[in-house]
Amino acid sequence: MKQLYGVIGNPIGHSLSPVMHNDAFEHLNMDAHYHAFLVKEEVLGEAVRGLKALGISGFNVTTPHKVAIMDYLDEIDPLAKQIGAVNTVVHKNGKLIGYNTDGIGFVRALQSISSEPLQEKRILLLGAGGASRAIYFSLADAGVKEIDVANRTVDKAKELIAACTATVHSVALSLEKATKEQGSYDIIIQTTTIGMHPRVEHTPLQISSLKKGTIVSDIIYNPFETKILCEAKEQGAIIQNGIDMFVYQGALAFEMWTGCVPNIERMKQLVIRKLGG
């Protein structure tokens, strides 16, 4: 019997997840299908119960449901609970179990371009929203010891740091102070929507004085190279856009559902083609 998987969100027509997962199923000769479900906020509970009744094997959760979905699940993974958001649900033994692969996917993506372990790196996170929270907790869970958070509202950065129970040395900074201190970091991670199409001329931090070998990663992938990445490249930095994070979080969900590891490079090239790269 064909296994059913999917993604719920609103809007959902733009999602690249069906193309990526269905290609992986076909490549691995698996009898499965991944479908995008448009689910409005007011019917989220009914939709989740319906998917469970249909026997869906697993599904992803995207905007605006990542927090609200938690009220309709049977179990939530401790890391997802700490992050406060779920983006992947596994249907196992009659239970819907929620996970967050966004942060772990980002960590795996970052490790893929770092020639050294992340644990000893000094990291700066730009932004203190949901994406930053997932990445912060996942980096801490991976053993990173030094993560500073810069945000337009410093109090929000302080709240994010205070919520983490892991042993991490962290300082909350203004974006102005982070700009001045950028040369002291090994990795800078841009987690806000600043620089996303159509406001491509904007950047949360002017790159001007990076040390040699710095990695600058931006979770945005439209455009492929945001202003911060262009500036970092001019400084000789190793740069990474959001495609890697998207692919790795999807691959991790795929692995959780099926027990099979998909071909990451195949997934990545497919997504790049679909985005017109």
UniProtKB/Swiss-Prot annotation:
<dbReference type="GO" id="GO:0009073">
    <property type="term" value="P:aromatic amino acid family biosynthetic process"/>
</dbReference>
<dbReference type="Pfam" id="PF01488">
    <property type="entry name" value="Shikimate_DH"/>
</dbReference>
<dbReference type="InterPro" id="IPR022893">
    <property type="entry name" value="Shikimate_DH_fam"/>
</dbReference>
<dbReference type="InterPro" id="IPR013708">
    <property type="entry name" value="Shikimate_DH-bd_N"/>
</dbReference>
<dbReference type="GO" id="GO:0050661">
    <property type="term" value="F:NADP binding"/>
</dbReference>
<dbReference type="InterPro" id="IPR041121">
    <property type="entry name" value="SDH_C"/>
</dbReference>
<feature type="binding site">
    <location>
        <position position="62"/>
    </location>
    <ligand>
        <name>shikimate</name>
    </ligand>
</feature>
<dbReference type="GO" id="GO:0005829">
    <property type="term" value="C:cytosol"/>
</dbReference>
<feature type="binding site">
    <location>
        <position position="219"/>
    </location>
    <ligand>
        <name>NADP(+)</name>
    </ligand>
</feature>
<comment type="function">
    <text>Involved in the biosynthesis of the chorismate, which leads to the biosynthesis of aromatic amino acids. Catalyzes the reversible NADPH linked reduction of 3-dehydroshikimate (DHSA) to yield shikimate (SA).</text>
</comment>
<dbReference type="InterPro" id="IPR006151">
    <property type="entry name" value="Shikm_DH/Glu-tRNA_Rdtase"/>
</dbReference>
<feature type="binding site">
    <location>
        <position position="87"/>
    </location>
    <ligand>
        <name>shikimate</name>
    </ligand>
</feature>
<keyword id="KW-0028">Amino-acid biosynthesis</keyword>
<feature type="binding site">
    <location>
        <position position="102"/>
    </location>
    <ligand>
        <name>shikimate</name>
    </ligand>
</feature>
<dbReference type="InterPro" id="IPR036291">
    <property type="entry name" value="NAD(P)-bd_dom_sf"/>
</dbReference>
<feature type="binding site">
    <location>
        <begin position="127"/>
        <end position="131"/>
    </location>
    <ligand>
        <name>NADP(+)</name>
    </ligand>
</feature>
<feature type="binding site">
    <location>
        <position position="242"/>
    </location>
    <ligand>
        <name>NADP(+)</name>
    </ligand>
</feature>
<keyword id="KW-0521">NADP</keyword>
<keyword id="KW-0057">Aromatic amino acid biosynthesis</keyword>
<feature type="binding site">
    <location>
        <begin position="15"/>
        <end position="17"/>
    </location>
    <ligand>
        <name>shikimate</name>
    </ligand>
</feature>
<dbReference type="GO" id="GO:0008652">
    <property type="term" value="P:amino acid biosynthetic process"/>
</dbReference>
<dbReference type="GO" id="GO:0009423">
    <property type="term" value="P:chorismate biosynthetic process"/>
</dbReference>
<dbReference type="InterPro" id="IPR046346">
    <property type="entry name" value="Aminoacid_DH-like_N_sf"/>
</dbReference>
<feature type="active site" description="Proton acceptor">
    <location>
        <position position="66"/>
    </location>
</feature>
<feature type="binding site">
    <location>
        <position position="221"/>
    </location>
    <ligand>
        <name>shikimate</name>
    </ligand>
</feature>
<protein>
    <recommendedName>
        <fullName>Shikimate dehydrogenase (NADP(+))</fullName>
        <ecNumber>1.1.1.25</ecNumber>
    </recommendedName>
</protein>
<comment type="subunit">
    <text>Homodimer.</text>
</comment>
<comment type="similarity">
    <text>Belongs to the shikimate dehydrogenase family.</text>
</comment>
<dbReference type="GO" id="GO:0004764">
    <property type="term" value="F:shikimate 3-dehydrogenase (NADP+) activity"/>
</dbReference>
<dbReference type="InterPro" id="IPR011342">
    <property type="entry name" value="Shikimate_DH"/>
</dbReference>
<dbReference type="Pfam" id="PF08501">
    <property type="entry name" value="Shikimate_dh_N"/>
</dbReference>
<feature type="binding site">
    <location>
        <begin position="151"/>
        <end position="156"/>
    </location>
    <ligand>
        <name>NADP(+)</name>
    </ligand>
</feature>
<dbReference type="GO" id="GO:0019632">
    <property type="term" value="P:shikimate metabolic process"/>
</dbReference>
<comment type="pathway">
    <text>Metabolic intermediate biosynthesis; chorismate biosynthesis; chorismate from D-erythrose 4-phosphate and phosphoenolpyruvate: step 4/7.</text>
</comment>
<keyword id="KW-0560">Oxidoreductase</keyword>
<dbReference type="Pfam" id="PF18317">
    <property type="entry name" value="SDH_C"/>
</dbReference>
